[in-house]
Amino acid sequence: MRVQRVQIMGAGALGSLVGALIQLAGYDVIFVARGKQLEALKKGLRVSGLKNAELKVYCTSQPEDADITFVTVKAYDTETVAKKLAEVDAGVVCSLQNGVGNEEILAKYCRKVLGGVTTYGANLKDYGHVVYAGEGYTYVGEMDGRVSGEAEMVAEVLRDAGMRAEAVNDIEFRIWAKAVVNAAINPITAICRVKNGEVVRNPHLWEVARAVADEGRQVMARMGYEFDAASEVRKVAEMTAENRSSMLQDLERGKRTEVEFINGAIVKKGEEFGIDCAVNRTLLNLVRGVESGL
């Protein structure tokens, strides 16, 4: 199948970057956005940072038919957008979201769903202006571990766009591994209002992060996955030392976070296995407390 139309469902920071790179590679891209971002995109999309470009883009508030649809909305909006995608032929739907459970929600409404994980860095400097902040890797795959033509097709489009992308047979492991790392970094940085590097530099914060990671490791072990969570948390925090986590940015902007789909998912899975994820639950409740005061 020849891919021509690619849709970005949720053209925020990451969605705008991915969409821009794909459009620059010659594909027709539909940017689905809302509010001030939609109004700004009607005037054009600016990319700065590792790549500089000014693009005229096709943007809309509702999804349309496409060959591939990348879902890049916040996890708490997944169900809402999944219902909208069910009303069109969205093609192969690939989540590039944070947290656990997005793919299962999408699969209730969409014909073909792939899981995805990306470490590319994007920040919205202003509405209609995305900063390409960091190169990374993007992995896509079937949730049941099969290697499929659809996953390879999606990876090929991303590679055409100049991204490092690979179709893999262990996407569920990668989604959980990213969630465990996020669980140890994001809430701590959000509550303490610090950059990622402080999680390893400050011994008090590192003690909490290591405990969160160990609970995640135990849960993943019961799922059949071996993951050295604490080492990975340290590595990611050091590599992104100057970054402000998305959860910190959300709280600073008075917005809801994705904590329910990160620490909340670990707590929930732990309960299934009889593992008490007390530190994850504490961070979950602290972030909930901050959110409720917004």
Curated annotation (Swiss-Prot):
Main localization of the protein described in the UniProt heading: cytoplasm
GO BP of this protein: coenzyme A biosynthetic process; pantothenate biosynthetic process
Protein localization: Cytoplasm
Cellular component, GO annotation: cytoplasm
Catalytic activity, as annotated: (R)-pantoate + NAD(+) = 2-dehydropantoate + NADH + H(+); (R)-pantoate + NADP(+) = 2-dehydropantoate + NADPH + H(+)
This protein's pathway: Cofactor biosynthesis; coenzyme A biosynthesis
Active site (record annotation): 178
SUPFAM superfamilies the UniProt entry points to: 6-phosphogluconate dehydrogenase C-terminal domain-like (SSF48179), NAD(P)-binding Rossmann-fold domains (SSF51735)
Residues holding NADP(+): 10-15, 34, 74, 98, 122, 258
Protein role: Catalyzes the NAD(P)H-dependent reduction of ketopantoate into pantoic acid.
Family statement: Belongs to the ketopantoate reductase family.
Protein name: 2-dehydropantoate 2-reductase
